[in-house]
């Protein structure tokens, strides 16, 4: 159960309501009027709680669950225990996410500028926007309606922020335009200089970074992410991208819609990711590359060439996934063989 000190719960919701908002179907025999009061894991859910099964690995836990209702793929519905109502979905995790959002909606902005905030006379703050103590809103900045600006956040000169966007504590935004319903977590840095220098033994000369960062609607940017502004072209984060904590995005990078970038990954300057690319944790992409739509980059990979649409790569330097797995297997056999030889000599 979520700690009520931190999470405010809505509801209850009927099975019919949850089916409607999640796109799931009520299984035959289930009562559409059944009221659910909360969500919970399979192992701990009770008769007034909703759970879900997405991974077949947990089918045994599903068979033993005490949940009042469960979201499940139709193929696994036969494993359900007696007394558990079912919502059938071919995407159970997505359906669960929509239901969980209903039970635990994001808190709305309370509205109002704290007396402890610093708001420039030429800055504009929309209706219902909350500006916390210590926040700094610089000259010419425009913040939309229903936004939340956290403590000690800095919104730089002429920055624009769309409606319903949240900027976390101690984040700093400059040289950027932020869309609507964007979530920016604490410590994020957007719009600082890109890493651009004319290298020379006589001394490195900084190249002025004259672009911006454009963040489109419905993006999430995790804690302590850094996104450099463009050198001339803009750095662009496409609609619906999800960026995990501690990610570095270099100048002129372009992320297409729906990309997912996982923690500690890095993307060097001028690289372009098409839509719905997945970049796993600690992977790195060198500059000036093109990563095709739907490509998947394995964790800790080092990408040094273009990646075709839909291709899966891994390793450093990154190669097609099957080739990488063969390399790992061969290396393992070589190491084990060498170990056997060493043991023979020592014996």
From Swiss-Prot:
Annotated catalytic residues: 251 (proton acceptor)
Entry coiled-coil feature ranges: none
Enzyme class: transferase
Alphabetized UniProt keyword annotations: Acyltransferase, Lipid A biosynthesis, Lipid biosynthesis, Lipid metabolism, Repeat, Transferase
EC number: 2.3.1.191
Enzymatic reactions: a UDP-3-O-[(3R)-3-hydroxyacyl]-alpha-D-glucosamine + a (3R)-hydroxyacyl-[ACP] = a UDP-2-N,3-O-bis[(3R)-3-hydroxyacyl]-alpha-D-glucosamine + holo-[ACP] + H(+)
Cellular-component GO terms for this entry: membrane
Pfam families for this protein: Hexapep, LpxD
Highest taxon listed in the record's lineage: Bacteria
A GO term, aspect molecular function: N-acyltransferase activity
CDD domains: LbH_LpxD (cd03352)
Keyword Transmembrane: no
Biological processes annotated in GO: lipid A biosynthetic process
UniProt xrefs under PROSITE patterns: HEXAPEP_TRANSFERASES
Pathway, per record: Bacterial outer membrane biogenesis; LPS lipid A biosynthesis
Known role: Catalyzes the N-acylation of UDP-3-O-acylglucosamine using 3-hydroxyacyl-ACP as the acyl donor. Is involved in the biosynthesis of lipid A, a phosphorylated glycolipid that anchors the lipopolysaccharide to the outer membrane of the cell.
HAMAP family found in the cross-reference section: LpxD (MF_00523)
Family, similarity comment: Belongs to the transferase hexapeptide repeat family. LpxD subfamily.
Classification via PANTHER family: UDP-3-O-ACYLGLUCOSAMINE N-ACYLTRANSFERASE, UDP-3-O-ACYLGLUCOSAMINE N-ACYLTRANSFERASE 1, MITOCHONDRIAL-RELATED
Quaternary context: Homotrimer.
Protein name (database record): UDP-3-O-acylglucosamine N-acyltransferase
Gene: lpxD
């Amino acid at each position: 159960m979520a700690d009520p000190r931190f999470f405010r719960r809505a509801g209850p919701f009927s099975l019919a309501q949850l089916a409607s908002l999640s796109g799931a179907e009520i299984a035959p025999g289930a009562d559409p009027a059944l009221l659910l009061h909360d969500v919970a894991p399979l192992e701990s859910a009770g008769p007034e709680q909703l759970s879900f099964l997405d991974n077949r690995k947990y089918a045994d836990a599903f068979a033993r669950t005490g949940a009042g209702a469960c979201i499940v793929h139709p193929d696994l519905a036969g494993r359900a225990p007696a007394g558990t109502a079912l919502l059938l979905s071919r995407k159970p995790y997505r359906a669960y996410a929509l239901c969980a959002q209903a039970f635990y909606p994001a808190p709305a902005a309370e509205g109002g500028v704290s007396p402890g905030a610093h708001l420039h006379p030429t800055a504009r703050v929309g209706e219902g926007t909350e500006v916390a103590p210590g926040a700094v809103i610089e000259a010419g900045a425009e913040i939309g309606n229903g936004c939340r600006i956290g403590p000690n956040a800095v919104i730089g000169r002429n920055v624009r922020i769309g409606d319903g966007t949240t900027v976390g504590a101690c984040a700093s935004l400059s040289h950027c335009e932020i869309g609507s319903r964007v979530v920016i977590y604490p410590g994020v840095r957007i719009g600082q200089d890109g890493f651009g220098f004319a290298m020379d033994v006589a001394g490195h000369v900084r190249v002025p970074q004259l672009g911006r960062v454009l963040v489109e609607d419905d993006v999430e940017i995790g804690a302590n992410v850094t996104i450099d502004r463009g050198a001339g072209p803009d750095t662009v984060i496409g609609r619906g991208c999800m960026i995990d904590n501690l990610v570095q995005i270099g100048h002129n990078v372009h992320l297409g819609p729906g990309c997912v970038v996982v923690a500690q990954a890095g993307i060097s300057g001028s690289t372009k990711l098409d839509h719905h690319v997945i970049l796993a944790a600690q992977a790195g992409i060198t500059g000036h590359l093109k990563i095709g739509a739907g490509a998947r980059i394995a964790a800790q990979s080092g990408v040094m060439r273009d990646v075709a649409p839909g291709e899966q790569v891994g390793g450093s330097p990154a190669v097609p996934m099957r080739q990488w797995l063969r390399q790992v297997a061969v290396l393992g056999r070589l190491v084990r063989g060498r170990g056997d030889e060493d043991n023979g000599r020592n014996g």
